[in-house]
UniProtKB/Swiss-Prot annotation:
PANTHER family: PROTEIN CMSS1
Name assigned to this protein: Protein CMS1
The family this protein is said to belong to: Belongs to the CMS1 family.
Pfam families attached to this UniProt entry: CMS1
Amino acid composition bias (Basic and acidic residues), ranges on this chain: 50-64
Gene that encodes it: CMS1
Length: 291
C-alpha cells in the first residue's frame, strides 16, 4: 500500500502554523514557501502590554515602598501651607464683606476684637467697651463698589450730619480720601505729617468759623484722620464734643493695605475702638457708618 504522504494530489497540507507551502496544480512547478509575518500593529500591542505591566508593577512597588521621614515632613508641611492659605483667603473675604454687613454682624466682629485686645479685663469692664445696635447706621443698601471714586456718592446717600469724621488707617490713605472729596476749605487732613498743635489749631478754627454761620449757609465739615492722631486731638481739646449738632463717623473699612489688613484689623484697631467709644460717651447724636 502506498503512503498517503507520497501522493501528489495537488493539494496543500499545513504542517507548520507559521509556514504555508503552496503547490501550483497547473504547471507542476516546485512548491513556493511563503512565511506568514506578524503585523506591526500586533508587535506594538505586545510591546504596549509589556510596558503597561512594567508600569503597573512599578506603580505597585512605589505604593508599597515606605515613605521616608523627610518625605513625611514635606507632605505635612505642604498640607499646613495649603490650610493656612485657605484660612487666609477666608479671613480676607470676611474683611471685605464686613462694611456692607448688618449692624448686628459689625457689632459681633467688634465684640470679638475688643475681647482679643483686652484679655485681662473682667466681663463687666468689657461690657463698657462694647458697642450697641443703635450706635451704627446700616449701609447695606449701597450697591456700588466701595472704592474712592464712589465715596462722595456714598456720603450724599447716607450721611446728613453737618460734621463728619472720616477715619482711615494710614497717612497715605488719609490723603487719598481727602482728594476724593476734592479737598477745600471745609475739609481737613489730620495726621502725623503735620504738627499736632497745627492740627488742633485747624480744628478750632473750622469749628469756630462754622458756629458763626447760619444753618442755611453752613457746609459740611470733614475731618479726615488716623485713629492715633484723633486720639491725641480729643485729649487736647473738647471742641469736637460740643454742640447738639449731629456727628457722623465714617470708617474707611473697605480699603485693604498690602498685608490685607483693614482699619478694623490693623495694629491700631484697638485705638480706633477707644476713640469711637469716647465720641459716643461725650457727644450726643453720634452715628457710625462703614464704607
Amino acid at each position: 500500500m502506498s503512503n498517503p504522504d507520497d501522493l501528489d494530489d495537488g493539494l496543500a497540507y499545513d504542517f507548520d502554523a507559521e509556514h504555508e507551502v503552496i503547490f501550483d496544480a497547473k504547471d507542476g512547478s516546485p512548491p513556493t514557501k511563503k512565511v506568514q509575518k506578524r503585523s506591526i500593529e500586533q508587535d506594538d500591542d505586545d510591546v504596549d502590554d509589556i510596558d503597561g505591566k512594567k508600569e503597573e508593577r512599578n506603580s505597585e512597588d512605589d505604593s508599597n515602598r515606605p515613605i521616608s521621614k523627610r518625605q513625611k515632613k514635606l507632605q505635612k508641611k505642604s498640607k499646613l501651607i495649603e490650610k493656612k492659605k485657605e484660612e487666609s483667603q477666608y479671613i480676607v473675604s470676611q474683611r471685605k464683606a464686613l462694611p456692607a454687613s448688618s449692624p448686628e454682624k459689625i457689632i459681633e466682629y467688634l465684640t470679638t476684637l475688643i475681647r482679643e485686645k483686652n484679655p485681662d479685663l473682667s466681663v463687666l469692664e468689657l461690657e463698657e467697651l462694647y458697642f450697641k445696635r443703635n450706635d451704627f447706621l446700616s449701609t447695606e443698601k449701597f450697591d456700588a463698589e466701595r472704592r474712592l471714586s464712589n465715596f462722595p456718592a456714598f456720603i450724599q446717600k447716607f450721611s446728613v450730619a453737618p460734621k463728619k469724621i472720616v477715619f482711615s488707617m494710614s497717612n497715605i490713605r488719609v490723603a487719598d480720601v481727602y482728594r476724593s472729596l476734592n479737598g477745600g476749605k471745609n475739609c481737613v487732613k489730620l495726621f502725623s505729617k503735620s504738627k499736632l498743635k497745627d492740627d488742633i489749631a485747624t480744628v478750632e478754627r473750622l469749628l469756630t468759623d462754622s458756629s458763626k454761620k447760619s444753618n442755611k449757609n453752613k457746609d459740611s465739615l470733614y475731618f479726615i484722620a488716623t485713629p492715633t492722631r484723633m486720639q491725641k486731638i480729643i485729649e487736647a481739646t473738647d471742641l469736637l464734643f460740643q454742640g447738639k449738632e449731629k456727628l457722623d463717623i465714617i470708617l474707611d473699612a473697605s480699603y485693604l493695605d498690602p498685608k490685607d489688613n483693614t482699619i478694623l484689623s490693623f495694629e491700631n484697631a484697638a485705638v480706633l475702638c477707644q476713640v469711637l467709644k469716647t465720641f459716643l460717651n461725650k457727644k450726643s447724636s453720634v452715628k457710625i457708618l462703614l464704607y
